[in-house]
Amino acid sequence: EDHIGGASEVIESLEVVNLIMPDAVSSSAAFSRLLDSVEKKGVDAHIAAPGDTYSVGDLQIEILSPLEESYENTNDYSAVVHARFGGVTFLFTGDAEAAVEKALLEEYPSSKLRSDVLKVGHHGSKTSSTEAFLNAVPPEIAVIEVGADNSYGHPSQKVLDRLDALGSRVYRTDISGNIVLTTDGDTIDAVTEKD
């Protein structure tokens, strides 16, 4: 549910033309609602494939992963997306875990992974955000989407320590609520719900 739980509501509420999603299926109610919304609204669904690029105005988007056709771990199907707006770069890793991070390090030069903003993988879990991966990315800003007092203990203190060692500014939804980052292509501004 945490992977796509709100996707159908987004499609129902906004004018969504295209949906990029991994080539994975689920028997969950959320996935079923998503497919129903895609069909009902006539959204054009695309399978995320490495090397696919998209442009939205001056925003350039590239799919980096999933690199494999199948994974044992559902989290590893997460689309890993690199985005560039002017001179500012973003890396969105979904719930991809350490095995995908390792594959990304092997597949791409560090210049492809280096990003100003990182959406930290898997809610800051210890199963993601390895030291090697974070060193390749070294984000100026790291965003962790995580529920307050969650039963999983996310985010991991080890991940927080790694980000601190890199000097990253960390924003967490459990502490700050909604987080909005804006950029003009040169600078990044952050506004949070609770701060």
Stretches with model-predicted labels:
Residues 1-195:
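Non-globular, low-confidence helical/coil segments that flank catalytic cores
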